[in-house]
């Protein structure tokens, strides 16, 4: 007699290969008919359930990738394609059905099947290498019991049976083994660099996005690779990354990794012919960054990925080339607190301040005044540099300011969304934990983030740096970032200590000579349009006032000529 077709659940034993086939059929149903048709067209096949072999070059063409990131992605898909029985690491090809399984896993679509599988562990295993020279095959040959949500006539008809598998009850899926595995740091750099390239591409018509992907991989890879190097500093310093360290880093890097994999799957499954995509997000004016020394595509992507990882309102800030507005460039407008005020204070949306310079190696005369006004934490006998700090370091910090700027000579401003980010020489994040953490002082005390109000009375000038703070002196020439995690610090605490695992518990300072200072406005399309209208209105008002003044000047001159104070030739009259 055949199996009962009642609604009662039952189990059936399958070989590991049959279990993989069941999962393959289930994953194929997670892609839409249009996506399946597109993939068949790209693979030049009649069905996506084929054992046709794809080489690394084939996959690179399918995903629009080149070396070096294509090899990392290829190995990742190879291993996941054989899930739940991860493939051997020396496999040289991947089949079409394995590609679909891997794609549904890395994109997160597999969650619709209610698999009891940890996504982070899946990604780690896909990127990882085993310490062992070989993997025993005995465990892979054991039959697997598969539970069904209802009875079926023929459990050996795998395509039909796959529709009724209770994937949530599959034992072993939830326990992806991570012990004894590690990720090569160099491969992690390549993957993060690729995802930063993807993150830098604004959402619009697919064909435009994919064209930009190819262009940036060809032309801008080195700058994104350097940004990928910076991101890996969030992972404990080792050439071999364990799961524990990888998992900790995903707390901040998770959104970047997830979006990157989703984008690649979309590239694979989307039709980019001109007629296929009629919807397009309106593209704003492209950012002109040629004059900026601190902002480029890779920097924007790095900041955007960091904000996304922070969560909260920071994650809601969309950072692209299209929604950044140049407000102030010290190299263009001059390094003056008044110039900074005139350029920045009219902007009523979030801003990003970037300050960069060279580490102070010798005391110069102009610095001595600032040094005398800035309280020392370290004894003169202590070395001013930690092992990771070098005398010739370039130092760059960014500050996300969520509230509009204001003169604050008596009371600080700002909310808890204010965030300090160290960009160079090590990437780190210092989250705001208290409001009123910013001052903009026009009476000779500069800018402070995380400080109390400075003292400025008669002949006494004194800064009051917080335990985690960035201080910029009034001439915009010198700056100090202070990070005191010990109880010895006496300043206020407006920012949390860094998230870098290696140095978050240490006390240190970055003192530097400022070479560049820039402020960029961040806004949605609506905010940018409203701000433009406001600026246009202010410009017209200024022109109108100038016109009135010129007319008034003409009337005043005629009156002076009548009384003989001004002659026709412009010479003064006698009294």
UniProtKB/Swiss-Prot annotation:
Classification via SMART domains: TLDc (SM00584)
Supply one GO CC term from the record.
fungal-type vacuole membrane
Subcellular location per the Swiss-Prot or TrEMBL entry: Cytoplasm
Major localization class: cytoplasm
Q: Does the keyword Nucleotidyltransferase apply?
A: no
Any one of the GO BP annotations:
protein-containing complex disassembly
Q: Which UniProt keywords apply?
A: Cytoplasm
A UniProt-annotated Pfam family: TLD
Q: Where is the TLDc domain?
A: 293-523
In terms of domain of life, where is this protein from?
Answer: Eukaryota
Sum up the protein's function in the record's words.
May be involved in a process influencing telomere capping.
Annotated family: Belongs to the RTC5 family.
- What's the protein called, per UniProt? Restriction of telomere capping protein 5
Protein source organism:
Meyerozyma guilliermondii (strain ATCC 6260 / CBS 566 / DSM 6381 / JCM 1539 / NBRC 10279 / NRRL Y-324)
């Amino acid at each position: 007699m055949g199996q009962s077709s009642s609604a009662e659940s039952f189990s059936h034993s399958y070989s590991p290969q049959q279990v993989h086939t069941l999962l393959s059929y289930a994953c194929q149903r997670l892609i839409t008919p249009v996506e399946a048709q597109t993939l068949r067209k790209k693979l030049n096949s009649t069905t996506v359930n084929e054992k046709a072999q794809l080489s690394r070059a084939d996959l690179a063409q399918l995903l629009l990738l080149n070396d070096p990131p294509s090899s990392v992605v290829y190995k990742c898909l190879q291993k996941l394609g054989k899930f739940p029985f991860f493939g051997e690491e020396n496999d040289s090809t991947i089949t079409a059905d394995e590609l679909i399984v891997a794609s549904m896993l890395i994109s997160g679509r597999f969650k619709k099947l209610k698999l009891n599988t940890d996504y982070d562990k899946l990604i780690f295993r896909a990127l990882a290498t085993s310490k062992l020279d070989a993997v025993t095959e005995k465990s892979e040959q054991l039959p697997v019991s598969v539970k069904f949500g209802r009875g079926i006539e023929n459990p050996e008809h795998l395509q039909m049976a796959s529709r009724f598998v209770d994937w949530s009850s599959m034992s072993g899926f939830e326990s992806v083994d991570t012990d004894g595995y590690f990720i090569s740091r160099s491969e992690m750099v390549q993957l993060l660099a690729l995802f930063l390239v993807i993150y830098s591409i604004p959402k619009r018509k697919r064909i435009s996005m994919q064209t930009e992907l190819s262009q940036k991989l060809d032309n801008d890879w080195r700058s994104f690779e350097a940004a990928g190097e910076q991101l890996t500093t969030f992972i404990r310093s080792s050439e071999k990354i364990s799961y524990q360290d990888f998992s900790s880093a995903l707390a901040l890097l998770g959104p970047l990794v997830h979006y990157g994999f989703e984008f690649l799957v979309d590239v694979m499954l989307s039709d980019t012919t001109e007629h296929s995509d009629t919807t397009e997000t309106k593209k704003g004016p492209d950012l002109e960054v040629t004059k900026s020394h601190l902002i480029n595509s890779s920097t924007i992507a790095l900041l955007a990925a960091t904000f996304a990882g922070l969560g909260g309102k920071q994650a809601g800030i969309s950072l692209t080339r299209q929604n950044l507005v140049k407000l102030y460039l010290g190299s263009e407008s001059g390094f003056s607190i008044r110039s900074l005020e005139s350029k920045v204070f009219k902007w009523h949306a979030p801003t990003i301040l970037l300050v960069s310079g060279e580490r102070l190696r010798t005391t110069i005369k102009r610095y001595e005044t600032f040094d005398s006004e800035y309280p020392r934490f370290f004894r003169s006998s202590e070395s001013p540099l930690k092992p990771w700090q070098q005398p010739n370091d370039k130092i760059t910090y960014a500050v996300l300011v969520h509230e509009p700027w204001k003169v604050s000579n008596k009371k600080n401003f700002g909310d808890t969304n204010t965030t300090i980010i160290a960009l160079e020489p090590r990437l780190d994040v210092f989250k705001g934990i208290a409001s009123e953490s910013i001052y903009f002082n026009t009476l000779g005390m500069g800018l402070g983030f995380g400080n109390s109000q400075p003292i400025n009375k008669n002949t006494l000038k004194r800064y009051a740096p917080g335990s985690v703070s960035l201080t910029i002196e009034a001439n915009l020439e010198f700056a100090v970032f202070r990070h005191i995690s010990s109880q010895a610090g006496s300043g206020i605490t407006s920012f949390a200590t860094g998230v870098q695992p290696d140095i978050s518990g240490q006390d240190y300072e970055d003192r530097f000579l400022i070479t560049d200072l820039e402020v960029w406005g961040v806004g949605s399309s609506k905010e940018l349009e409203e701000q433009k209208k406001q600026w246009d209105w202010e410009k017209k008002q200024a022109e109108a006032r100038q016109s009135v003044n010129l007319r008034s000047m003409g009337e005043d001159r005629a009156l002076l000529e009548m009384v003989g104070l001004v002659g026709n030739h412009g010479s003064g009259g006698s009294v």
